[in-house]
Amino acid sequence: MTARASTLSLMDVLLPRATLVQNILLIFSGSLLVALCAQISFYLPFSPVPVTGQTFALLLVGATFGARRAAAALLLYLAQGAIGLPVFAPGGLPGLARFAGPTAGYLLAYPLAAFLLGWLTERLSRRAWLLAVLAAEAVIFAGGVSWLKVWAQLTWPQAAAQGLLPFLPGDLLKVVLVGACLPASWWALEKRRPTRER
């Protein structure tokens, strides 16, 4: 494998000359994956923010699609929710009203987190995937906790207690799952590629 290939996203290597149609399909599939994973959700009794599978899907899309496709997929996901499609986690406000609710900060941070994760994976060694994923998680929690503090008129410790600390164990599991998927995906891709392209 060439040195340049190590700085490309998984999809860039899989589709080195992706057409416009292929890129559109990838972006749509990324938004669909996030929407499907969002349906896996439950609420904790002491927080207005649900535990969902959204962030797992975001991390997977960000780590494999590259910065621009990942950000576009998450922007499309937010647009789908804004017009009323049932893509957000169940139980919250519908449509645009969701962006005035307790989870708005997390949602609005999604495209930035996806872009950052994609940007880092395009530039860092694959062994540095943990750093890239943690940076994306930090962006999500920064947006989410900051908005929750304002929305619920909480102190910073209260906002962290409701919007950060309860979710750390679950998000650690998501990081581990993404970390398990990435090496396996790269290994499978490299097994398929001719030796002369490596």
Task: Please place each PLM-identified region on the residue numbering.
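Membrane-embedded alpha-helical hairpins and interfacial helices in multi-pass inner-membrane proteins
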Residues: 124-197
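Hydrophobic transmembrane alpha-helices
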Residues: 2-73
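Structural signal for the C-terminal ends of transmembrane alpha-helices
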Residues: 64-68, 116-124, 184-190
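Short helix-perturbing small/polar motifs within transmembrane alpha-helices
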Residues: 2-15, 22, 36, 94-142, ...
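Alpha-helical membrane segments and adjacent membrane-interface helices in multi-pass membrane proteins
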Residues: 41-116
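Juxtamembrane/transmembrane-helix boundary motifs in multi-pass membrane proteins
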Residues: 14-18, 22, 46, 89, ...
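Peri-membrane helix termini and adjoining interfacial loops of integral membrane proteins
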Residues: 2-8, 82-90, 152-158
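Alpha-helical transmembrane segments in multi-pass membrane proteins
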Residues: 26-37, 58, 62, 73-81, ...
